[in-house]
Design a protein with these regions (language model features):
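Walker B catalytic acidic pair
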Residues: 107
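Active-site-proximal or metal-binding-adjacent scaffold patches in catalytic folds
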Residues: 4-102, 111-150
């Protein structure tokens, strides 16, 4: 991976007819953050339709963290902040899509759970209330992702 200001040049491998090819993808961190924040607003609005008390809260702030390697995302409920693992966006198109469609809502729902029910043993983490919100949002309440970066 090479850094050029706000852009990152990523070298990845693809297989075509059994042959490995190397291709590079330029990913602008600012543009990615903007896309994540736009998607966050959509997800938050959908959650507010399901749970009207959420309308009195601001959607969480999204930050990209290049130091997260195993965790795709991490919600810091008391700070209304979500860190997303940058490497997962760069690894493959499938991981990129999973980060937007599964991991981002998963982390936002942690914030919604905290805003609705507070921080307690019953609601913290992947408790029953969080699972209920995930299901009502249309996602499987999985605790872990299956995206492994080598």
């Amino acid at each position: 991976m090479l850094y050029f200001g706000e852009c990152v040049l990523v070298y990845s491998k693809i297989v075509c007819n059994g042959l490995w090819f190397v291709y590079n993808v330029a990913m602008d961190r600012k543009q990615l953050t903007k896309q994540l924040n736009n998607q966050t607003l959509i997800i938050w609005d959908n959650l507010c339709e399901l749970y009207s008390p959420l309308t009195k809260y601001n959607p969480p702030i999204i930050e990209i963290n290049g130091r997260i390697y195993r965790t795709a995302g991490r919600c810091h409920q008391e700070d209304n902040l979500i860190h997303m693992g940058y490497k997962f966006f760069l690894y493959s198109k499938e991981f990129y899509n999973n980060m937007f469609n599964i991991i981002l809502p998963h982390e936002i729902i942690h914030q919604a759970d905290y805003n609705l029910f507070g921080l307690s043993e019953a609601t913290c983490g992947h408790g029953k209330k969080w699972q209920e919100i995930m299901i009502n949002y249309g996602l499987s309440p999985d605790k872990h992702h299956n995206m492994w970066i080598k």
